[in-house]
Protein backbone atom coordinates (compact mmCIF):
# COMPACT_ATOMS: atom_id res chain seq x y z
CA UNK A 1 0.00 0.00 0.00
CA UNK A 2 2.83 2.38 0.84
CA UNK A 3 4.41 1.62 -2.48
CA UNK A 4 1.21 2.54 -4.24
CA UNK A 5 0.97 5.78 -2.27
CA UNK A 6 4.56 6.62 -3.08
CA UNK A 7 3.93 5.85 -6.70
CA UNK A 8 0.82 8.06 -6.67
CA UNK A 9 2.76 10.91 -5.06
CA UNK A 10 5.53 10.52 -7.61
CA UNK A 11 3.06 10.40 -10.45
CA UNK A 12 1.27 13.48 -9.06
CA UNK A 13 4.55 15.35 -8.86
CA UNK A 14 5.42 14.24 -12.37
CA UNK A 15 1.98 15.40 -13.51
CA UNK A 16 2.49 18.81 -11.89
CA UNK A 17 5.94 19.06 -13.45
CA UNK A 18 4.48 18.15 -16.82
CA UNK A 19 1.80 20.84 -16.37
CA UNK A 20 4.47 23.39 -15.43
CA UNK A 21 6.59 22.43 -18.40
CA UNK A 22 3.52 22.59 -20.65
CA UNK A 23 2.68 26.07 -19.35
CA UNK A 24 6.30 27.15 -19.83
CA UNK A 25 6.29 25.77 -23.35
CA UNK A 26 3.00 27.51 -24.12
CA UNK A 27 4.40 30.80 -22.75
CA UNK A 28 7.57 30.32 -24.77
CA UNK A 29 5.45 29.51 -27.82
CA UNK A 30 3.41 32.71 -27.34
CA UNK A 31 6.60 34.75 -26.96
CA UNK A 32 8.03 33.11 -30.05
CA UNK A 33 4.84 33.87 -31.99
CA UNK A 34 4.99 37.51 -30.85
CA UNK A 35 8.67 37.75 -31.87
CA UNK A 36 7.82 36.14 -35.19
CA UNK A 37 4.98 38.66 -35.77
CA UNK A 38 7.28 41.56 -34.86
CA UNK A 39 9.98 40.32 -37.24
CA UNK A 40 7.39 39.88 -40.00
CA UNK A 41 6.20 43.47 -39.38
CA UNK A 42 9.81 44.69 -39.54
CA UNK A 43 10.31 42.71 -42.72
CA UNK A 44 7.19 44.23 -44.33
CA UNK A 45 8.32 47.69 -43.23
CA UNK A 46 11.74 47.07 -44.77
CA UNK A 47 10.10 45.97 -48.01
CA UNK A 48 8.02 49.19 -48.10
CA UNK A 49 11.12 51.29 -47.40
CA UNK A 50 12.99 49.41 -50.12
CA UNK A 51 10.21 50.15 -52.66
CA UNK A 52 10.13 53.82 -51.59
CA UNK A 53 13.91 54.01 -51.94
CA UNK A 54 13.74 52.59 -55.47
CA UNK A 55 10.99 55.11 -56.37
CA UNK A 56 13.09 57.99 -54.97
CA UNK A 57 16.04 56.77 -57.01
CA UNK A 58 13.94 56.64 -60.21
CA UNK A 59 12.56 60.15 -59.59
CA UNK A 60 16.05 61.53 -58.99
CA UNK A 61 17.36 59.99 -62.21
CA UNK A 62 14.37 61.41 -64.15
CA UNK A 63 15.00 64.92 -62.79
CA UNK A 64 18.67 64.65 -63.70
CA UNK A 65 17.79 63.63 -67.28
CA UNK A 66 15.37 66.59 -67.58
CA UNK A 67 18.07 69.06 -66.49
CA UNK A 68 20.56 67.62 -68.98
CA UNK A 69 17.97 67.81 -71.82
CA UNK A 70 17.20 71.50 -71.04
CA UNK A 71 20.92 72.32 -71.02
CA UNK A 72 21.47 70.64 -74.41
CA UNK A 73 18.45 72.50 -75.90
CA UNK A 74 19.83 75.83 -74.69
CA UNK A 75 23.26 75.11 -76.17
CA UNK A 76 21.60 74.31 -79.52
CA UNK A 77 19.60 77.58 -79.49
CA UNK A 78 22.76 79.59 -78.76
CA UNK A 79 24.56 77.93 -81.69
CA UNK A 80 21.62 78.74 -84.02
CA UNK A 81 21.64 82.42 -82.95
CA UNK A 82 25.38 82.65 -83.55
CA UNK A 83 24.96 81.21 -87.07
CA UNK A 84 22.15 83.70 -87.82
CA UNK A 85 24.33 86.62 -86.64
CA UNK A 86 27.19 85.47 -88.87
CA UNK A 87 24.82 85.21 -91.86
CA UNK A 88 23.48 88.73 -91.30
CA UNK A 89 27.01 90.08 -90.91
CA UNK A 90 27.88 88.63 -94.34
CA UNK A 91 24.72 90.17 -95.86
CA UNK A 92 25.60 93.60 -94.42
CA UNK A 93 29.10 93.36 -95.92
CA UNK A 94 27.58 92.54 -99.33
CA UNK A 95 25.18 95.51 -99.04
CA UNK A 96 28.05 97.83 -98.20
CA UNK A 97 29.90 96.59 -101.31
CA UNK A 98 26.77 97.22 -103.43
CA UNK A 99 26.51 100.77 -102.09
CA UNK A 100 30.18 101.45 -102.89
CA UNK A 101 29.68 100.19 -106.45
CA UNK A 102 26.54 102.34 -106.84
CA UNK A 103 28.47 105.39 -105.67
CA UNK A 104 31.21 104.66 -108.22
CA UNK A 105 28.62 104.37 -111.01
CA UNK A 106 27.03 107.62 -109.88
CA UNK A 107 30.40 109.42 -109.94
CA UNK A 108 31.13 108.11 -113.46
CA UNK A 109 27.71 109.21 -114.72
CA UNK A 110 28.14 112.68 -113.21
CA UNK A 111 31.55 113.02 -114.89
CA UNK A 112 30.12 112.03 -118.28
CA UNK A 113 27.25 114.47 -117.80
CA UNK A 114 29.71 117.26 -117.09
CA UNK A 115 31.66 116.42 -120.28
CA UNK A 116 28.43 116.47 -122.31
CA UNK A 117 27.50 119.85 -120.86
CA UNK A 118 30.91 121.26 -121.79
CA UNK A 119 30.57 119.94 -125.37
CA UNK A 120 27.12 121.52 -125.68
CA UNK A 121 28.47 124.86 -124.46
CA UNK A 122 31.34 124.66 -126.96
CA UNK A 123 28.87 123.92 -129.78
CA UNK A 124 26.77 126.92 -128.83
CA UNK A 125 29.79 129.18 -128.88
CA UNK A 126 30.78 127.88 -132.32
CA UNK A 127 27.28 128.52 -133.60
CA UNK A 128 27.42 132.13 -132.44
CA UNK A 129 30.84 132.58 -134.02
CA UNK A 130 29.46 131.27 -137.31
CA UNK A 131 26.60 133.72 -137.20
CA UNK A 132 28.98 136.64 -136.58
CA UNK A 133 31.26 135.57 -139.43
CA UNK A 134 28.48 135.16 -142.02
CA UNK A 135 30.19 137.53 -144.43
CA UNK A 136 33.28 135.37 -145.01
CA UNK A 137 34.22 133.58 -148.26
CA UNK A 138 32.57 130.41 -149.43
CA UNK A 139 35.41 128.20 -148.32
CA UNK A 140 35.24 129.77 -144.91
CA UNK A 141 31.47 129.30 -144.93
CA UNK A 142 31.81 125.69 -145.99
CA UNK A 143 34.38 125.14 -143.31
CA UNK A 144 32.20 126.81 -140.73
CA UNK A 145 29.19 124.83 -141.92
CA UNK A 146 31.21 121.67 -141.54
CA UNK A 147 32.28 122.80 -138.09
CA UNK A 148 28.65 123.63 -137.30
CA UNK A 149 27.52 120.23 -138.55
CA UNK A 150 30.25 118.64 -136.50
CA UNK A 151 29.30 120.76 -133.51
CA UNK A 152 25.63 119.74 -133.92
CA UNK A 153 26.70 116.12 -134.14
CA UNK A 154 28.81 116.60 -131.02
CA UNK A 155 25.86 118.30 -129.33
CA UNK A 156 23.52 115.48 -130.36
CA UNK A 157 26.01 112.92 -129.11
CA UNK A 158 26.36 114.95 -125.95
CA UNK A 159 22.56 114.99 -125.57
CA UNK A 160 22.43 111.24 -126.12
CA UNK A 161 25.21 110.74 -123.60
CA UNK A 162 23.41 113.10 -121.25
CA UNK A 163 20.16 111.18 -121.64
CA UNK A 164 21.99 107.88 -121.18
CA UNK A 165 23.82 109.29 -118.19
CA UNK A 166 20.54 110.63 -116.79
CA UNK A 167 18.89 107.24 -117.33
CA UNK A 168 21.78 105.43 -115.67
CA UNK A 169 21.75 108.02 -112.91
CA UNK A 170 18.03 107.40 -112.34
CA UNK A 171 18.65 103.65 -112.25
CA UNK A 172 21.58 104.23 -109.93
CA UNK A 173 19.44 106.40 -107.67
CA UNK A 174 16.77 103.67 -107.57
CA UNK A 175 19.45 101.06 -106.81
CA UNK A 176 20.89 103.37 -104.20
CA UNK A 177 17.47 103.87 -102.62
CA UNK A 178 16.93 100.11 -102.59
CA UNK A 179 20.38 99.57 -101.16
CA UNK A 180 19.73 102.22 -98.51
CA UNK A 181 16.40 100.56 -97.72
CA UNK A 182 18.12 97.18 -97.45
CA UNK A 183 20.82 98.79 -95.34
CA UNK A 184 18.22 100.34 -93.05
CA UNK A 185 16.43 97.00 -92.81
CA UNK A 186 19.76 95.31 -92.13
CA UNK A 187 20.64 97.90 -89.49
CA UNK A 188 17.22 97.41 -87.91
CA UNK A 189 17.78 93.66 -88.03
CA UNK A 190 21.23 94.14 -86.50
CA UNK A 191 19.72 96.26 -83.72
CA UNK A 192 17.06 93.61 -83.20
CA UNK A 193 19.70 90.90 -83.20
CA UNK A 194 21.82 92.89 -80.76
CA UNK A 195 18.80 93.11 -78.49
CA UNK A 196 18.19 89.40 -78.98
CA UNK A 197 21.87 88.80 -78.33
CA UNK A 198 21.60 90.81 -75.13
CA UNK A 199 18.60 88.71 -74.13
CA UNK A 200 20.46 85.56 -75.14
CA UNK A 201 23.46 86.71 -73.14
CA UNK A 202 21.25 87.25 -70.12
CA UNK A 203 19.66 83.85 -70.75
CA UNK A 204 23.11 82.31 -71.05
CA UNK A 205 24.11 83.83 -67.72
CA UNK A 206 20.86 82.58 -66.23
CA UNK A 207 21.46 79.16 -67.77
CA UNK A 208 25.02 79.18 -66.46
CA UNK A 209 23.67 79.92 -63.00
CA UNK A 210 21.03 77.23 -63.52
CA UNK A 211 23.72 74.90 -64.83
CA UNK A 212 25.85 75.58 -61.76
CA UNK A 213 22.79 74.98 -59.61
CA UNK A 214 22.01 71.88 -61.67
CA UNK A 215 25.59 70.69 -61.15
CA UNK A 216 25.20 71.25 -57.44
CA UNK A 217 21.84 69.47 -57.53
CA UNK A 218 23.45 66.73 -59.62
CA UNK A 219 26.16 66.34 -56.98
CA UNK A 220 23.43 66.32 -54.35
CA UNK A 221 21.46 63.81 -56.45
CA UNK A 222 24.52 61.61 -56.82
CA UNK A 223 25.10 61.79 -53.07
CA UNK A 224 21.41 61.03 -52.53
CA UNK A 225 21.62 58.15 -55.02
CA UNK A 226 24.66 56.76 -53.21
CA UNK A 227 22.88 57.16 -49.87
CA UNK A 228 19.69 55.57 -51.23
CA UNK A 229 21.73 52.77 -52.81
CA UNK A 230 23.48 52.11 -49.49
CA UNK A 231 20.16 52.25 -47.68
CA UNK A 232 18.68 49.88 -50.25
CA UNK A 233 21.58 47.45 -49.81
CA UNK A 234 21.24 47.74 -46.03
CA UNK A 235 17.49 47.14 -46.30
CA UNK A 236 18.09 44.13 -48.55
CA UNK A 237 20.64 42.76 -46.07
CA UNK A 238 18.25 43.35 -43.18
CA UNK A 239 15.45 41.73 -45.17
CA UNK A 240 17.66 38.72 -45.89
CA UNK A 241 18.60 38.51 -42.21
CA UNK A 242 14.93 38.84 -41.26
CA UNK A 243 14.04 36.01 -43.64
CA UNK A 244 16.70 33.83 -42.03
CA UNK A 245 15.43 34.78 -38.56
CA UNK A 246 11.83 34.05 -39.56
CA UNK A 247 12.93 30.68 -40.92
CA UNK A 248 14.74 29.90 -37.65
CA UNK A 249 11.73 31.00 -35.62
CA UNK A 250 9.43 28.87 -37.73
CA UNK A 251 11.67 25.88 -37.07
CA UNK A 252 11.72 26.77 -33.36
CA UNK A 253 7.91 27.07 -33.35
CA UNK A 254 7.63 23.70 -35.04
CA UNK A 255 10.02 22.20 -32.49
CA UNK A 256 8.14 23.75 -29.56
CA UNK A 257 4.82 22.57 -30.97
CA UNK A 258 6.25 19.06 -31.32
CA UNK A 259 7.65 19.26 -27.79
CA UNK A 260 4.31 20.56 -26.47
CA UNK A 261 2.52 17.73 -28.24
CA UNK A 262 4.96 15.26 -26.68
CA UNK A 263 4.37 16.75 -23.22
CA UNK A 264 0.61 16.60 -23.76
CA UNK A 265 0.93 12.97 -24.76
CA UNK A 266 3.06 12.27 -21.68
CA UNK A 267 0.52 14.15 -19.55
CA UNK A 268 -2.27 12.08 -21.06
CA UNK A 269 -0.31 8.90 -20.41
CA UNK A 270 0.26 9.93 -16.78
CA UNK A 271 -3.41 10.86 -16.43
CA UNK A 272 -4.42 7.52 -17.87
CA UNK A 273 -2.02 5.76 -15.51
CA UNK A 274 -3.41 7.71 -12.53
CA UNK A 275 -6.93 6.83 -13.55
CA UNK A 276 -5.91 3.18 -13.75
CA UNK A 277 -4.23 3.41 -10.35
CA UNK A 278 -7.30 5.03 -8.78
CA UNK A 279 -9.44 2.33 -10.30
CA UNK A 280 -7.10 -0.31 -8.89
CA UNK A 281 -7.26 1.31 -5.43
CA UNK A 282 -10.99 1.45 -5.62
CA UNK A 283 -10.99 -2.29 -6.18
CA UNK A 284 -9.32 -2.85 -2.83
Swiss-Prot record:
Asked whether the keyword Repeat is assigned, the reply is yes
Q: What are the boundaries of the region Disordered? A: 32-60
Q: Write out the biased-composition intervals (Polar residues).
A: 44-60
Q: Quote the InterPro entries the UniProt record gives.
A: Tropomyosin (IPR000533)
Ranges annotated as biased composition (Basic and acidic residues) = 32-41
Q: What is known of its domains?
A: The molecule is in a coiled coil structure that is formed by 2 polypeptide chains. The sequence exhibits a prominent seven-residues periodicity.
Subunit description: Homodimer.
Q: What is this protein called?
A: Tropomyosin
Organism of this sequence: Mytilus edulis (Blue mussel)
Amino acid sequence: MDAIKKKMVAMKMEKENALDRAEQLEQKLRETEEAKAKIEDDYNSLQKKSIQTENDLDNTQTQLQDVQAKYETTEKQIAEHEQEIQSLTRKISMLEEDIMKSEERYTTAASKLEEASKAADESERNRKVLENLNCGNDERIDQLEKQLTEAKWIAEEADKKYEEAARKLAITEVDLERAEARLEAAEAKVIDLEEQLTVVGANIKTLQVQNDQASQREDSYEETIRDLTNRLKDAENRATEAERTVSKLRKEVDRLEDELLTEKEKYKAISDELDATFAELAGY
